[in-house]
Amino acid sequence: MGSLFRSETMCLAQLFLQSGTAYECLSALGEKGLVQFRDLNQNVSSFQRKFVGEVKRCEELERILVYLVQEINRADIPLPEGEASPPAPPLKQVLEMQEQLQKLEVELREVTKNKEKLRKNLLELIEYTHMLRVTKTFVKRNVEFEPTYEEFPSLESDSLLDYSCMQRLGAKLGFVSGLINQGKVEAFEKMLWRVCKGYTIVSYAELDESLEDPETGEVIKWYVFLISFWGEQIGHKVKKICDCYHCHVYPYPNTAEERREIQEGLNTRIQDLYTVLHKTEDYLRQVLCKAAESVYSRVIQVKKMKAIYHMLNMCSFDVTNKCLIAEVWCPEADLQDLRRALEEGSRESGATIPSFMNIIPTKETPPTRIRTNKFTEGFQNIVDAYGVGSYREVNPALFTIITFPFLFAVMFGDFGHGFVMFLFALLLVLNENHPRLNQSQEIMRMFFNGRYILLLMGLFSVYTGLIYNDCFSKSVNLFGSGWNVSAMYSSSHPPAEHKKMVLWNDSVVRHNSILQLDPSIPGVFRGPYPLGIDPIWNLATNRLTFLNSFKMKMSVILGIIHMTFGVILGIFNHLHFRKKFNIYLVSIPELLFMLCIFGYLIFMIFYKWLVFSAETSRVAPSILIEFINMFLFPASKTSGLYTGQEYVQRVLLVVTALSVPVLFLGKPLFLLWLHNGRSCFGVNRSGYTLIRKDSEEEVSLLGSQDIEEGNHQVEDGCREMACEEFNFGEILMTQVIHSIEYCLGCISNTASYLRLWALSLAHAQLSDVLWAMLMRVGLRVDTTYGVLLLLPVIALFAVLTIFILLIMEGLSAFLHAIRLHWVEFQNKFYVGAGTKFVPFSFSLLSSKFNNDDSVA
């Protein structure tokens, strides 16, 4: 938790890598994930860097592996994924691996090409057999005539044509037969009629079964056609039209004997093709199964090798071109591991001269490194979505672990809904090692990544549901109500007390639709409910009024405490960066302004709750009126909450008024005095540099990175650094804007926390409406079929509860909780202007196959 409170101390290290050991050293660093490399070749194009050839080789290997994975998936062969990630391949094995993969690719492409060719031939032969079978039905004559006109028996019997004319026509008859897509038949026929001007006779028949297209592989419906024409020119036109409509044209036999011979030959060839195709597929599957055993490790190895060469391209060579120089950011705590990794890489390469490192001082801002685990990672991502924390500033994620699910639960307070959410998150946590959860759809994967957030959100919702005493909009009476209805009846009290109290009798109960419990009557109110809200309020008509008052005050209290805590965290930042003047001139005035107004409001709320009981609540003054009178100084005196209230409030207002000019002018005037009193403004006593930032505070402290076990000490700052330009007007304007924003933000941010009350009220009302419209109707059915009606009612109630109250309302409360943390809480102390530490780590490479048959 210590590292989660503040980012780790970083140092800039210079690595000296021998050319022969650089690959092995970076492989060892990638396995450990210790350092973030700086690009020392920013001015060099990516195509002109030293190891661009090796990167292209890795990309070529990736292309081959993607092809292999696609073929393996196409063959429905499972891809084994190992639990342990294989190391990067040694350099001496890279060429061998490349040759193996290229040879395997050539073999697979050749076998696949032959298989596709065989399959295409087989489909064409099957189409040919279907065409012969169907066109045989077009022939209506059993006696063979001349082959050029045997398909037109009607020509002989036509009274308009004599036999000699038929012979002249028959001498020029021709036939085109084949198959055409079902959707193109109508257009094909119209085109033939218009182009050939009626000099064709077309016969169609639909195939009973769908066939696979040899070209596209799509299974579609086909029509067999037979076109009879006369004239060579008409024949050329018919063939061109068939080509335009992508018809599959096959030779048409002239005689029945020729048809039989072709049919027998086709059957033989089809059987032979089936045999050859099966053997080819078996061989292809054997090759793919053998390739599938090692493709996972090959993919990971190639990706690691490519990542290593990308990092090597960020290094520079020394003057002798025998040593690579790299600059890396490394946490102080990992320096020893970094040295051991370099030694390990040098030892594996067998180099005589080991690689080594050196710590170099720098004035640059280091990246922010915050160590997380699977529990804290989700909360850290919420903070980083707003902005990565500046180097060494307080990290809000440590406190967000508790405050975020708690504020969510305040808006989502329902025992039943929270318990359902808790069970769902618990199921994800218990099955977090299941491989399918990481490969699920994006929405489910998002739930899985935030499983611990959901777990705490559900757990805290159970707690707030107990406080609100809400379980699916109904109250639970666990300890017995603190209110006694029977004590209101006149029969419960002596006759002498009847005139002093407003009691009930049978007539009052019959003639009044609304009855009021009086806590001043003895025995009516026996004390507060042990846990949460008394269940009797669920029956009261003024329940909403009571809950609104309670939740509104609770929202204000939580909001002011949350914001005050943010200001206090800012003090830790000032102490760490040794800017104590910010504590006295910024943080303390901010705290005084906040506490003297809104802190006093919390005091009045708690004072009224503690001093005035249920019996004396009638005479309790209004907090709203008292708070308004605090600023108006009315002439008419009120009773007030306590003695001396007026003097206390005036003192608080005076302190508030005095804190505002200090907040506006204190820091700029102090910096002006500091500037005039020193010849060099850039350095303070601890060697921290004061640099002004444009978007944040004009002055912030950045430590000189002399952190190699205290060996480097900061000498005279005025001799080391140039003096910074001091602009008093800009500093004053920045501080004035910040002060105005803070003073107005105290009011607007406090009002913003009222969303806790608003969303809690909305959630409770939606739950109540859903219960009233479904469950209440189903439970009131007292017929013999009531049980049958109750089952679909419960099912519908469960579905609407999940989709409306859990998902939609939960998402709304989640977004509002994020806003309260980002805006109202973090702007009190969190700058969020840093850069995230992105280590060179092989663990960041995905080890799962994606839907595109690759590993991302």
UniProtKB/Swiss-Prot annotation:
Its main location: membrane. One of its GO terms (molecular function) is ATPase binding. The chain crosses the membrane at residues 394-412, 415-431, 446-475, 550-569, 588-608, 652-671, 740-764, 786-824. GO terms for biological process: cellular response to increased oxygen levels; Golgi lumen acidification; immune response; intracellular iron ion homeostasis; proton transmembrane transport; regulation of macroautophagy; vacuolar acidification. It is found in: Cell membrane; Endosome membrane. V-ATPase is a heteromultimeric enzyme made up of two complexes: the ATP-hydrolytic V1 complex and the proton translocation V0 complex. The V1 complex consists of three catalytic AB heterodimers that form a heterohexamer, three peripheral stalks each consisting of EG heterodimers, one central rotor including subunits D and F, and the regulatory subunits C and H. The proton translocation complex V0 consists of the proton transport subunit a, a ring of proteolipid subunits c9c'', rotary subunit d, subunits e and f, and the accessory subunits ATP6AP1/Ac45 and ATP6AP2/PRR. Subunit of the V0 complex of vacuolar(H+)-ATPase (V-ATPase), a multisubunit enzyme composed of a peripheral complex (V1) that hydrolyzes ATP and a membrane integral complex (V0) that translocates protons. V-ATPase is responsible for acidifying and maintaining the pH of intracellular compartments and in some cell types, is targeted to the plasma membrane, where it is responsible for acidifying the extracellular environment. Essential component of the endosomal pH-sensing machinery. Belongs to the V-ATPase 116 kDa subunit family. This is V-type proton ATPase 116 kDa subunit a 2. It comes from Homo sapiens. The lineage of its organism: Eukaryota, Metazoa, Chordata, Craniata, Vertebrata.
